[in-house]
Amino acid sequence: MRLRSLVGNRAEIVGPETSVVDVAKVMLEHNVAAVAVVDRTGLIGICTDRDLARGLATGCDDSALASDLMTASPDVVGPDIEVSDAAAWMLETGYRHLPVVEDGELLGIVDIRDVLWALVSPDA
């Protein structure tokens, strides 16, 4: 099974100037733990629940922006990578979210739950 089959709707997207409060609201509203940070050139970062927690723990306030806390220039994967290879890479790197990009276009973000479900699901 390839990641393409796990990428559903597009990722939730915010701009680099989005406040961290609004980033948290997007995550809560859409029940996601990561959002893509995109500008006019495309994907420039990913902001996760861990990034928000790290920011709070190190003293950022509600005036901070997505660009202040995001992981800039995140590693990305293509949609045709095998789920098992993605799982191995996530284990090796500690990543819990993988932006899936094809021909420069963000298709979505696959998280560790998606990957684990695909590996253990009898329908996979």
Model region roles, listed by residue range:
Residues 13-31, 38, 77-94, 101, ...:
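The conserved cystathionine-beta-synthase
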